[in-house]
From Swiss-Prot:
Signal sequence bounds: 1-23
Family: Belongs to the O2 superfamily. Contryphan family.
Upper taxonomic lineage: Eukaryota, Metazoa, Spiralia, Lophotrochozoa, Mollusca
Modified residues (Cysteine amide): C62
Any one cellular-component term (Gene Ontology): extracellular region
Protein name in UniProt: Contryphan-Vi
């Protein structure tokens, strides 16, 4: 049983090494991405966005 465990661990290390070496080298999209402005209306726009996303029950506020 001990030899089987060692064999599985060695296989896992070899596979992970192969994946790292053969990777395409691109950076993940979120590492250097520019943050999107979800609230272009400033603080009041942010408040309205929160109300809209939460299903605002008070329609004069939600528009």
């Amino acid at each position: 049983m001990g030899k089987l465990t060692i064999l599985v661990l060695v296989a896992a290390v070899l596979l992970s090494t192969q994946v790292m070496v053969q990777g395409d080298g691109d950076q993940p999209a979120d590492r250097n991405a520019v943050r999107r402005d979800d609230n272009p209306g400033g603080l009041s726009g942010k408040f309205m966005n929160v109300l809209r996303r939460s299903g605002c029950p008070w329609h004069p506020w939600c528009g």
